[in-house]
């Protein structure tokens, strides 16, 4: 009996353990700050990134980009069992990028969902918010932000001759 209790307790406690967050943010979601950016430029970057990863664009405006991709394999089966039933459509992975202009910068955050449609049209949606997923999203966001911030044009300083004129 003692072994059984120890095994159950160990399984329970190890199931509660999470990967630590690589970067703490105010919202708890993956965030990025694009310096000196326009909303339309950042929206286009996220649309491009979604297309490159095989997502389709459901919605794209200056403040929000919604991308989706039909899931496949075991993850689709597990998701369908968790949030749907045998009559549900194949689940979709949905990424929602929210963009906001702050002074001369654009602040972006991303949320991750799984969604399926039940037999009579009811939508079943669940947010995927755990440290592992947040870390993956944050590393992608950091890569996109650093690419943007390193490639943007830096204004040339006037030369000595231009200053004299």
Feature annotation, model-predicted:
Residues 17-165:
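Ser/Thr-rich, low-complexity intrinsically disordered terminal regions
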Residues 2-7:
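Sec-dependent signal peptide recognition
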Residues 9-10, 43:
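Residue-level signal for mature regions of secreted extracellular proteins and peptides
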Residues 12-15:
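C-terminal motif of bacterial Sec signal peptides marking the signal peptidase cleavage site
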């Amino acid at each position: 009996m003692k072994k059984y209790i120890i095994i159950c307790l160990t399984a329970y406690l190890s199931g509660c353990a999470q990967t630590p967050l690589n970067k703490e943010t105010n919202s708890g979601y993956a965030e990025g700050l694009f310096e000196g950016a326009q909303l339309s430029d950042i929206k286009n970057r996220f649309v491009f990134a979604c297309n490159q990863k095989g997502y389709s664009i459901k919605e794209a405006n200056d403040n929000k980009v919604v991308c989706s991709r039909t899931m496949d394999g075991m993850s689709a089966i597990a998701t369908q069992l968790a949030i749907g039933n045998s009559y549900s459509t194949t689940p979709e992975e949905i990424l929602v990028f929210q963009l906001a202009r702050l002074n001369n910068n654009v602040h972006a955050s991303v949320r991750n969902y799984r969604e399926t449609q039940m037999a009579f049209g009811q939508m079943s949606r669940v947010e995927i918010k755990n440290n592992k997923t947040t870390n993956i999203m944050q590393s992608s966001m950091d890569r996109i932000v650093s690419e943007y911030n390193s490639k943007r044009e830096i204004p040339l300083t006037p030369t000595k001759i231009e200053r004299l004129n």
